[in-house]
Amino acid sequence: MGRRPARRYRYCKNKPYPKSRFCRGVPDAKIRIFDLGRKKAKVDEFPLCGHMVSDEYEQLSSEALEAARICANKYMVKSCGKDGFHIRVRLHPFHVIRINKMLSCAGADRLQTGMRGAFGKPQGTVARVHIGQVIMSIRTKLQNKEHVIEALRRAKFKFPGRQKIHISKKWGFTKFNADEFEDMVAEKRLIPDGCGVKYIPNRGPLDKWRALHS
């Protein structure tokens, strides 16, 4: 018996069932890489950010996440170059799905017990996604806006249900508004730190604040 189609595992019916010492023998997830492109680009290089947002409460298989990642990456490399973007998959497949294998050969009724002891063995992993949760994000330069929308639109076809494409008002992968970001950096309220930023609050020892602004 082959793999069941993923539509059998689309809906979130049971509680989360992660890999643990009670749930052993779980096959590895198909998706192993969650960040692609120019991961080490500084925060000020890629101000534009686009999100793919789920519109349903459902389960997405690790195979679907991997297929969407490859699809978006291939299009962005072709249109923006391999150093012109940074893709981040925001879901991780931690929920284990099970299968109660049934024999379909002759004399199967003598070998198996039907629905007695039907808990099932681990078959694969899925990610549970809520309404409004971000599935995938891409940050890039402002002139690549149309390419980001097209890459996410193509990746949408790898998932069941409905997803929305949203161009963020934030700067890159940070939580600060794009129209205020550069002013906050100039005032030293934000310090660039890799692909993120450190926020410097107005509270704390005065000598630290003076040393920063001297």
UniProtKB/Swiss-Prot annotation:
Alphabetical keyword list: Citrullination, Cytoplasm, Developmental protein, Isopeptide bond, Ribonucleoprotein, Ribosomal protein, Ubl conjugation
Modified residues (Citrulline): 32
Any one GO cellular component localisation term in the record: cytosolic large ribosomal subunit
Pfam families membership: Ribosomal_L16
Subcellular location: Cytoplasm
Post-translational modification: Citrullinated by PADI4.
Matching SUPFAM superfamilies: Ribosomal protein L16p/L10e (SSF54686)
Transmembrane annotation, as ranges: none
Glycyl lysine isopeptide (Lys-Gly) (interchain with G-Cter in SUMO2) crosslink location in chain: 175
GO MF term list: structural constituent of ribosome; translation regulator activity
Signal sequence residues: none
Biological process per Gene Ontology, one example term: translation
Subunit text: Component of the large ribosomal subunit. Mature ribosomes consist of a small (40S) and a large (60S) subunit. The 40S subunit contains about 33 different proteins and 1 molecule of RNA (18S). The 60S subunit contains about 49 different proteins and 3 molecules of RNA (28S, 5.8S and 5S).
Family: Belongs to the universal ribosomal protein uL16 family.
Protein name: Large ribosomal subunit protein uL16
Upper taxonomic lineage: Eukaryota, Metazoa, Chordata, Craniata, Vertebrata
Gene: RPL10
